[in-house]
Amino acid sequence: MATVDRWLLPDGIEEVLPPEAARIETARRRVLDLFQRWGYELVITPHVEFLESLLTGSGQDLDLRTFKVIDPLSGRQMGLRADITPQVARVDAHTLRREGPSRLCYAGSVLHAKPQALSTSRSPIQLGAELYGDASASSDLEVISLMLEMLELADVPDVHMDLGHVGIYRGLAKAAALSGEAEQRLFDALQRKAMDEIEQLTAALDPALASMLRALARLCGGRETLDDARHALAAAPAGVQAALETLATVADQLALRYPQVPLYFDLGELRGYHYHTGMVFAAFVPGVGQSIAQGGRYDDIGADFGRARPATGFSTDLKTLVGLGNADLTTPVAGIWAPYGDESGLWGAIRDLRRQGERVVQALDGQSQADAAQLGCDRQLQLSNGIWTVASLAS
């Protein structure tokens, strides 16, 4: 192996160096503190689990993004986590087993076998919050509000929200008695807004249902979209009407809480359709093609762990959040340079300063004071009249 190959990293795998690593860690602490103030408890899940647990309740996409290895102890196949959400669902359903609502949050590195989009990282730091045990619109409102508070804390500018509800399409597809294959083909056409293809796929359906399914591709835009949807879907089944009202209720409350955040609706955009069961939402900023934070309701995820619970939540990539935000994440780097040696009182003075929160760098044997500035020190610890005191580095 050539020397150059020893330090090359795989495509999409990054290391974070000073001072950026300190900025990311500061952001992580601030966001987790925010979650804690909202009542969310931190959980730390393992980097690797048996594959069945990691892929529970997820679609094929997560399977393709998961690195697989063989456990040398058990011989079973394991996966390196590509998404922390299923792990937290396992914690809620199988480990905690609480009866009432449970609020959990997390932050940790994940690894993707394949990037989610062109030029995206395969080693993001996933950060998120989940609310289990409540099926009402109030929990959807809470997690979306918390996500917006997180983006505000990071000072991400020009955020706009995209809201939808997969229950609308699910209800119409069920009423039309579409086969699994037909439902998937129509879903794909809706994502591309391929109107000719949508017309063809719905041609043999009941005219009223066909009209409503075709309307989904056109129901996108601002707040007026919901009024248009009420008219276009007036004959839809009760479940579709309920989903539309949930969407409207949450949107109204968000508009009151965050009037500065534009809301956009697209009833044909079914993000996470094979995973989510209710409201879906995502935050976007100009100039970035992918959502910067996203989430939704996924009420069936705990079933494979023996305990289905209503659930909703969101996640983001912490590195992306820091890169887009304008929050001041700098940490004081000034420090005190302490000399090398074992003079009386030196070690005690160094320990006292560190306990007071000072950053103290002690010289190594043979290291000169000339290195102090490079190490971020602007002061020095010196012996004066038998007492160790802090003075300017220039003195």
Curated annotation (Swiss-Prot):
Subcellular location: Cytoplasm
A single Gene Ontology CC term: cytoplasm
Pathway named in the protein's UniProt entry: Amino-acid biosynthesis; L-histidine biosynthesis; L-histidine from 5-phospho-alpha-D-ribose 1-diphosphate: step 1/9
GO terms (BP aspect): L-histidine biosynthetic process
InterPro entries, A to Z: aa-tRNA-synth_II/BPL/LPL, HisRS-like_core, HisRS/HisZ, HisZ
SUPFAM superfamilies in UniProt: Class II aaRS and biotin synthetases
Tagged with keyword rRNA processing: no
Keyword list, A-Z: Amino-acid biosynthesis, Cytoplasm, Histidine biosynthesis
Protein family: Belongs to the class-II aminoacyl-tRNA synthetase family. HisZ subfamily.
The protein's role, per its UniProt record: Required for the first step of histidine biosynthesis. May allow the feedback regulation of ATP phosphoribosyltransferase activity by histidine.
Additional detail: This function is generally fulfilled by the C-terminal part of HisG, which is missing in some bacteria such as this one.
Assembly, per entry: Heteromultimer composed of HisG and HisZ subunits.
Protein name in the entry: ATP phosphoribosyltransferase regulatory subunit
Gene that this polypeptide is encoded by: hisZ
